[in-house]
Design a protein with these regions (language model features):
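Beta-rich, blade/repeat-based domains predominating
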Residues: 57-68, 110-128, 132, 168-187, ...
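Beta-propeller fold detector
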Residues: 96-105, 160-165, 207-222, 272-286, ...
């Protein structure tokens, strides 16, 4: 048997090494404040912060986009069971009109020159608007047109051009839903077959990434106050990745299937020629354990605003990963995609999606009118 001789002070050296290692880990690992914290249960704002802004007795609006000049855009997708127009503008005098005009909202005609199935809108800092047209006006039927992006000058109210989504990036069951744009790149989520499409706008080329990735696939049911959101036939509504936003600097995108958790991806990986397929699968980070969402938007400072359909709440999440429950109110019946103006207001459609025709065997049970609420955001830091 071999006997190992112990060197003098070996115990001291080991202790010193452990102390040094512990100190190194303390520096390398994030402090507890760096991790995301739980969403507060008590809302910060009182009921008086939420006031009716406008209403519709014919359409279920699922998204709102405030324009810098005080006008407001509303999306009313065909798949929900809405009559036209699918995109409309509320002028400063309170009147409504199809947007950008009646021809682009026509129910028939050349699919390349009209909105077939509105599926997402996003306003850029330069004042131009991008509209996603999925080409799928009925989620239970095949596509009737090739999906496209429509670029609109909101000052002149004219279409600047369109970008067709390449068919090679699509699956037969693809239903595009959700768009975010930074400079010359558009990011589009696929809610029919989970994935994200990256569109180079100048070349009109499209590439597909994260195909059927678990984080983007509907693995959890959409929860509403009464239980699970179901289609009219009783099946749980399974909708893959349909919500997306890009950070103001274009470095990150966040994506989510309505019932899943929020994921974050660094956009540079999409243009990295050396990344392997295996590494690509690992680039997705779970960013927050969100509840079921009806929509989200991002502010110029990177703050995310979420519509929580499980509790009829509006939540926010800062770049420092600080969550806030801004308001909870039963009037926010299935809140949709909110719109942020430049004056500290968030506009939220209470879209009652669970009562729309698509979820009620073709016959809507919506309590009219559908209301868009104005929420005055807090100007103070979150409570500690």
């Amino acid at each position: 048997m071999m006997i190992r001789r112990t060197r003098p002070f070996s115990g001291f050296r080991r202790a010193l090494a452990l102390t040094t290692l512990t100190a190194s880990l303390a520096v390398a690992l994030p402090t507890p404040s760096a991790w995301a914290v739980h969403m507060p249960k008590v809302p910060e704002l009182s009921v008086s912060a939420l006031t009716p802004f406008t209403q519709s007795d014919k359409q279920v609006w699922d998204a709102v986009v405030p324009l810098p000049d005080g006008r407001m855009l509303f999306e009313a997708p065909a798949w929900i069971g809405n009559p036209g127009p699918q995109l409309s503008v509320r002028n400063t005098d309170g009147s409504f009109a199809p947007y950008p005009d009646a021809d682009w909202n026509a129910a028939e005609g050349d699919a390349a020159k009209r909105i077939v199935a509105a599926a997402g809108v996003t306003l850029l800092p330069d004042g131009t608007l991008w509209v996603l047209d999925s080409g799928v006006p009925n989620r239970k039927a095949p596509a009737v047109a090739q999906p496209k992006l429509i670029h609109i000058d909101t000052q002149k109210n004219t279409v600047l051009g369109t970008v067709a989504i390449e068919k090679t990036a699509l699956h037969p069951d693809s239903i595009l839903s959700g768009v975010a744009v930074h400079e010359n790149t558009a990011y589009v989520t696929d809610s029919g077959v989970a994935g994200v499409l990256v569109v180079d706008i100048p070349s009109a080329s499209t590439r597909r990434f994260l195909d059927r990735h678990p984080s983007l696939t509907a693995t959890r049911p959409i929860q509403i106050p009464g239980g699970t959101l179901n289609w009219g036939d009783g099946r749980a509504a399974a909708i893959d990745s349909s919500m997306i936003a890009v950070s103001p600097d274009g470095r990150w995108i966040v994506m989510q299937a309505p019932g899943n958790y929020l994921s974050r991806v660094e956009t540079s990986t999409f243009s990295d020629p050396d990344i392997t397929p295996a590494a690509m699968e690992e680039i997705v980070t779970q960013w927050y354990k969100t509840p079921s969402l009806g929509g989200m938007t991002i502010g110029p400072d990177g703050t995310l605003y979420w519509s929580d359909v499980s509790t009829n709440s509006i939540l926010s999440y800062s770049t420092g990963r600080i969550p806030r429950r801004l308001i909870t109110n039963p009037r926010l019946n299935f809140p949709g995609t909110p719109g942020l103006d430049a004056h500290g207001h968030l506009f939220v459609p209470a879209m009652q999606l669970n009562h729309a025709a698509a979820f009620q065997n073709g016959k809507a049970t919506v309590t009219w009118p559908v209301t868009v609420y104005q929420l005055t955001l807090p100007t103070t830091p979150p409570p500690t």
